[in-house]
Amino acid sequence: MTTLTARPEAITFDPQQTALIVVDMQNAYATPGGYLDLAGFDVSTTRPVIANIQTAVTAARAAGMLIIWFQNGWDAQYVEAGGPGSPNFHKSNALKTMRKQPQLQGKLLAKGSWDYQLVDELVPQPGDIVLPKPRYSSFFNTPLDSILRSRGIRHLVFTGIATNVCVESTLRDGFFLEYFGVVLEDATHQAGPEFAQKAALFNIETFFGWVSDVETFCDALSPTSFARIA
């Protein structure tokens, strides 16, 4: 068992019954020229987050944790995104941006596009699981719950973008399904102003889960090897 120092209190888990969730580390969310950038969100500070996720993934894999990567998006015709009868049609900033800029149609969050791809620095390895998701929560219309339950996994460690949207949505849904969720705050990034990051982390540590950081996580898994991993 491993005890991780976190807020508001430490949490103990078995790494081999824990999954590291990497949420939407796609060009859309982390790279200039991607969806968030084109929609007016600041992605200029995502590079350290990518590096921290690399470090966390390496440590988690060495400890025997399952790594699950998510990619948010839809088919090239956006059928999966929903039409006017879906609130997603009205609230998705990607869909709204494409309606305002028709030349982007088919380029934002479309499966097979550069926007949809994971950033170059983050490459899933054999044994990892890569799943698509059509909405903010990684539990909605995906086999995530079944995958976790069949492996006896009850603890989830979250990284990715955006903290206040897809990361928080997934952790909340996991909480309702009786999963213990931990966010590594320096391996996440918000969509919007910095206060959105702070608010999301406050919500998580106060109501739904725990908050820690990459160095503490790596040190808890293998205190003697963190320097080598970093």
Swiss-Prot record:
Induction: Up-regulated by the nitrogen regulatory protein C (NtrC also called GlnG) and repressed by RutR. InterPro entries: Isochorismatase-like_dom, Isochorismatase-like_hydrls, Isochorismatase-like_sf, RutB. It is an enzyme of class 3 (hydrolase). Keywords: Hydrolase. The keyword Lyase does not apply. CDD domains: cysteine_hydrolases (cd00431). It catalyses: (Z)-3-ureidoacrylate + H2O + H(+) = (Z)-3-aminoacrylate + NH4(+) + CO2; (Z)-3-ureidoacrylate + H2O = (Z)-3-aminoacrylate + carbamate + H(+); (Z)-2-methylureidoacrylate + H2O + H(+) = (Z)-2-methylaminoacrylate + NH4(+) + CO2. One of its GO terms (biological process) is nitrogen utilization. Disulfide bonds: none annotated. GO terms for molecular function: hydrolase activity, acting on carbon-nitrogen (but not peptide) bonds, in linear amides. Its EC number is 3.5.1.110. Signal peptide: none annotated. Transmembrane segments: none annotated. The active site is at 24 (proton acceptor), 133, 166 (nucleophile). Gene3D superfamilies: Isochorismatase-like. It comes from the Bacteria. Belongs to the isochorismatase family. RutB subfamily. NCBIfam families: RutB (TIGR03614). PANTHER family: ISOCHORISMATASE-LIKE DOMAIN-CONTAINING PROTEIN, PEROXYUREIDOACRYLATE/UREIDOACRYLATE AMIDOHYDROLASE-RELATED. Hydrolyzes ureidoacrylate to form aminoacrylate and carbamate. The carbamate hydrolyzes spontaneously, thereby releasing one of the nitrogen atoms of the pyrimidine ring as ammonia and one of its carbon atoms as CO2. This is Ureidoacrylate amidohydrolase RutB. It comes from Escherichia coli O7:K1 (strain IAI39 / ExPEC).
